[in-house]
Amino acid sequence: MAIKLIVGLRNPGSAYEQTRHNAGAWLVTALAQRHNSHFKIDKKMQAELTEIDINNHPCRLLLPLTFMNHSGQTTRIISQFYKIEPGEILIVHDELDLPVGRIKLKTGGGHGGHNGLRDITAQLGTGEFHRLRIGIGHPGHKDLVHQYVLSRPSMHDRQQIYDAIDRGIAIIPIVLSGDIARAMNQVNA
């Protein structure tokens, strides 16, 4: 099944723009820029939206205007409006359980403690969507997680995250064609 919607999870606003938690939005923004596509704010949809077309595979890109914990509402509104099934959605998000700079593509599963994924799963009524997980590393203790995800990465970590984003963008044409298994083999290796 081809991907028709890519969602970059984030917290909106300049205070959060450069935080680890916004790594998903970094990838989706970079993807739009590489295809000379510009986001437009749609307040009714609670989102910034744009479209790209790669090899005759059109896809909408979404950056929610809601905070991370309410990403599901925007994702549901957009998917219902455009008649996009959960299996046609790719959620791009930060991942504590991957080392900084790793990136993995996954289909389905639980939320793994990620509140954005938790809300999307609740709003869509299923976890059977695709996820592109960008490793941001773990602070070592669960009590430090909140502060960690809302902090800016070091220059070294930021570069590793950008390198992972480049690898993620490289598989998007494969993902849009619907060959998820091939994309997984390429990026998860």
Curated annotation (Swiss-Prot):
Function: Hydrolyzes ribosome-free peptidyl-tRNAs (with 1 or more amino acids incorporated), which drop off the ribosome during protein synthesis, or as a result of ribosome stalling. Catalyzes the release of premature peptidyl moieties from peptidyl-tRNA molecules trapped in stalled 50S ribosomal subunits, and thus maintains levels of free tRNAs and 50S ribosomes.
GO BP field: protein quality control for misfolded or incompletely synthesized proteins; rescue of stalled ribosome
NCBIfam families noted in UniProt: pth
Site positions for Stabilizes the basic form of H active site to accept a proton: 94
Record-level GO cellular component terms: cytoplasm
Subunit structure of this chain's protein: Monomer.
Catalytic activity, EC: 3.1.1.29
Cellular localization per UniProt: Cytoplasm
Gene: pth
Protein keywords: Cytoplasm, Hydrolase, RNA-binding, tRNA-binding
Binding site for tRNA: 16, 67, 69, 115
Gene3D superfamilies (UniProt xref): Peptidyl-tRNA hydrolase
Record field: catalytic activity: an N-acyl-L-alpha-aminoacyl-tRNA + H2O = an N-acyl-L-amino acid + a tRNA + H(+)
Assigned protein family: Belongs to the PTH family.
Species the sequence originates in: Legionella pneumophila (strain Lens)
Disulfide cysteine pairs (residue numbers): none
Site positions (Discriminates between blocked and unblocked aminoacyl-tRNA): 11
MF term (GO), any: tRNA binding
Transmembrane helix recorded as keyword: no
Active site (UniProt): 21 (proton acceptor)
Official protein name in the record: Peptidyl-tRNA hydrolase
Cited CDD domains: PTH
Chief location category: cytoplasm
